């Protein structure tokens, strides 16, 4: 189990070449308009992503792939849930990069697929509890956004880590719930986050791809 956890941690590390640092998931737009101005705003925004936004939808996709569900319906759901062109490119391109690198590291090859589906598909072979896989994915997802927010708002590094730690209870609860949630119950409801992701496509001055 230790070896399996190390491998999953490697795959979800910021150093793994999926260019996660290039995506803000609409945060850059929300910060530029003043919707997110401090650590408290950031925490509330990320909580919404985690409980009703794309983050929790990704958690379902990771869980179902890790549990061995057919991958094609999961890939179709991932594309359908991407609310904008940039959101689709975010999950598609990171997934392709993840698959390309893990194909060189693993005995079996996967075809390109959306990022959460690819992570879940690879994690299935590790034999880890599905809830644990989901929890680590959610933490990595949110950690990447916090890193971007620290630079954009800006926040101090300590404030960023405080936000991250404040999310742990919700991550734990969500991971347990999402581990058994069927694909038929997947969905998103973080409307402001989706609108920010759409508006980012026409933002004139920007650093991040999404």
From Swiss-Prot:
Major subcellular site: cytoplasm
Molecular-function annotations in GO: nickel cation binding
Location(s) in or outside the cell: Cytoplasm
InterPro entries: UreF, UreF_sf
Superkingdom of source: Bacteria
Gene Ontology cellular component annotations, sorted alphabetically: cytoplasm
Keywords from the named record: Chaperone, Cytoplasm, Nickel insertion
Assembly with partners or alone: UreD, UreF and UreG form a complex that acts as a GTP-hydrolysis-dependent molecular chaperone, activating the urease apoprotein by helping to assemble the nickel containing metallocenter of UreC. The UreE protein probably delivers the nickel.
Described purpose of this protein according to its UniProt entry: Required for maturation of urease via the functional incorporation of the urease nickel metallocenter.
Family note: Belongs to the UreF family.
Record protein name field: Urease accessory protein UreF
Organism whose genome encodes this protein: Dinoroseobacter shibae (strain DSM 16493 / NCIMB 14021 / DFL 12)
Gene of this entry: ureF
């Amino acid at each position: 189990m230790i070896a399996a956890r190390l491998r999953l941690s490697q795959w979800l590390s910021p150093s793994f070449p999926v260019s996660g640092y290039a995506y803000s998931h609409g945060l850059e737009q929300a910060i530029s308009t003043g919707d997110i101005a401090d650590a408290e705003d950031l925490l509330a925004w990320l909580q919404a992503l985690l409980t009703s936004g794309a983050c929790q939808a990704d958690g379902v996709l990771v869980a179902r792939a890790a549990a061995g569900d057919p991958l094609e319906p999961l890939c179709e759901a991932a594309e359908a849930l991407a609310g904008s062109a940039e959101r689709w490119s975010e999950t598609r391109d990171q997934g392709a990069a993840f698959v390309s690198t893990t194909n060189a590291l693993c005995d079996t090859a996967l075809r390109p697929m959306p990022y959460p589906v690819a992570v879940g598909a690879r994690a299935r072979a590790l034999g880890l509890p599905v809830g644990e896989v989901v929890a680590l994915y959610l933490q990595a997802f949110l950690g990447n956004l916090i890193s971007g927010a620290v630079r954009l708002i800006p926040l101090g590094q300590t404030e960023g880590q405080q936000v991250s730690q404040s999310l742990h209870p919700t991550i734990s609860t969500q991971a347990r719930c999402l581990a058994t949630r069927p694909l038929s119950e997947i969905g998103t409801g973080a409307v402001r986050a989706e609108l920010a992701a759409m508006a980012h496509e026409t933002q004139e001055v920007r650093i991040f791809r999404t």
